[in-house]
Amino acid sequence: MARSKATDPPADLLGPVQGEVSWFCCGTAWGPCSSTGKGACGTCNSGSLQHAWPNTSDACWSITRPDRCGVSLSRRTCGYRHRVTALCSGASVVTAIADCGPQTDLFCGERSCCGATCADNRLIDLTPAAYSQIASLSSGLRPVEISSA
């Protein structure tokens, strides 16, 4: 869901926001992922129900910049739990922040759809374990609603 230009620092997330979800690898090898770094929080693992959020710190925000896509997202730090609900199926998963990302400003206006149901802007990355709870990893991107758990 597009919001007006964000202020700096961004306004608090007043309710659910819609956007795209993708998936990423972190930590120990799992499924399609080889071993890699543990993410900005130092706890990220591909086999855990975790996610990356674009506003975990000032340093993170300076890289991801969802405000450049017209989206204002609240500051949430490591361990904060979000519920991610697939707009296509209604399936949802609760995950904890374990990394900074995605770099939203690289994907402004990007859109994913299932039929006539669409969402814009890549706002959250799930680990493969979490993403596979709401969609097939082969789908790559899906429209979702993100809310506090």
Task: Give the residues covered by each predicted segment.
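Secreted/periplasmic proteins
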Residues: 2-149
